[in-house]
Amino acid sequence: MAVHFYDAAYDLEKALRNSDEYSRLRGLYDQVNADESAKRMFDNFRNVQLQLQQKQMSGEEITQEEVEQAQKTVALVQQHELISQLMEAEQRMSMLIGELNKIIMKPLEELYGSQQ
């Protein structure tokens, strides 16, 4: 029976890869990487994002200075049209995956009762 779950998961992965949402995300990501200035800006944004996430996950406090720097970085990348479109596409893909996760978790929520 477990093999069936993996087959379904791989089918879902294939469906995501073939979706319009993923195609748009991939296309925008490729465009950002092809533009040297946009790539540098986006890589810097991702590094700031990852550093803050790592600090948060390790229980370290994020300083006000780091918060302000992150806000400046976000404001800067949002001004770049291509990066802004990429971030919107990432958000749509993340929402789609979140909705799929809710569907997958539904049996456990029904079993244990929803906390929402």
Curated annotation (Swiss-Prot):
InterPro entries: Com_YlbF, YheA/YmcA-like_dom_sf. Disulfide bonds: none annotated. Gene3D superfamilies: YheA/YmcA-like (1.20.1500.10). SUPFAM superfamilies: YheA/YmcA-like. Pfam families: Com_YlbF. Belongs to the UPF0342 family. This is UPF0342 protein RBAM_010030. It comes from Bacillus velezensis (strain DSM 23117 / BGSC 10A6 / LMG 26770 / FZB42).
